[in-house]
Swiss-Prot record:
Pfam families per UniProt: LytTR, Response_reg
Native source species: Vibrio cholerae serotype O1 (strain ATCC 39315 / El Tor Inaba N16961)
A GO CC term attached to the entry: cytosol
Protein known as: Uncharacterized response regulatory protein VC_A0850
Keyword Disulfide bond annotated: no
Domain of life according to the entry: Bacteria
InterPro entries: CheY-like_superfamily, LytTR_DNA-bd_dom, Sig_transdc_resp-reg_receiver, WalR-like
Length: 261
């Protein structure tokens, strides 16, 4: 039984983390077959429905469908896999996981923590433990938390510049501009404005940012309100936001954001 093969699906929107987790699992649990890897919640759910894995490693924050919603939908399936949530530290989430004996991994991933997690999963699989009751209770607790807890917005964003990956503090952003399938993030470093790329839609990013700090002023532009120098209107009635010696257009439909009541 020790060498029995089990299957798993990995779901996280960070390619580097998926690669790292896959590599660690190959070392710590060679008999575990990774049957699919997903970059968002929708793809994860499709992969789980197709492969019916024994284990799912599920990131909480993913585009298109978050990990909590994926887990909620898993409860409707005939076979509910063992779920391991992956999360950046969140005291409410961690407390909920521990209360309901649901395993979780904190970012950045720890090899020793993952080894302990794998051992626990193998014990549960050998005992054929049904995870649905604990998972259902956890989903119920998360529903209560989302009604009572203040939303947690992103503090950092991972973005690329050339071949490098950078951590960008959202407070340092000047503005964001949608460019085809990517977003261009702009921030000042020294006396120079630098551009970083993030593969996401503007809608997905806005859902992660504090709406009191980041305003969409145009269908393709979001600005950090705290970085605005001034707002002007030209002779034609067009409104402009001035940030770091730049002029950014404000669409007519969004000019009300800057009206003085």
């Amino acid at each position: 039984m020790m060498n029995q093969t089990y299957t798993a699906v990995l779901a996280d929107d960070e390619p580097l983390l998926r690669h790292h987790l896959n590599k660690l699992l190959a070392e710590l649990w060679p008999a575990l077959e990774i049957v699919a890897s997903a970059e968002n919640g929708q793809i994860a759910l499709q992969a789980i429905e197709q492969h019916q894995p024994d284990v799912v490693f599920l990131d909480i924050r993913m585009p298109k469908m978050d990990g909590i919603e994926v887990a909620r939908r898993l409860l409707q399936q005939p076979k509910v896999p063992l779920v391991v949530f992956i999360t950046a530290y969140d005291e409410y989430a961690v407390s909920a996981f521990e209360t309901h004996a649901i395993d979780y991994l904190l970012k950045p991933l720890s090899s020793s923590r993952l080894a302990s997690c794998c051992e626990k999963l193998q014990q549960q699989l050998r005992r054929n433990v049904a995870p649905s009751n604990d998972l259902a209770q956890l989903m119920s607790q998360f529903e209560q938390l989302t009604r009572t807890v203040k939303p947690q917005y992103q503090v950092w964003l991972k973005a690329s510049k050339g071949e490098e990956i950078h951590l960008i503090a959202v407070n340092e952003l000047l503005y964001v501009k949608a460019e085809d399938k990517y977003l261009s993030l702009y921030k000042v470093h020294g006396a120079t404005t630098h551009e970083y790329l993030l593969r996401s839609s503007l809608k997905e990013l806005l859902a992660q940012l504090d709406p009191n700090q980041f305003w969409q002023i145009h269908r393709s532009i979001v600005v950090n309100v705290g970085k605005i120098d001034k707002v002007t209107r030209d002779f034609g009635g067009k409104m402009w936001v001035h940030i770091d010696r730049l002029q950014l257009p404000v669409s007519r439909a969004l000019q009300h954001l800057f009206k003085v009541s």
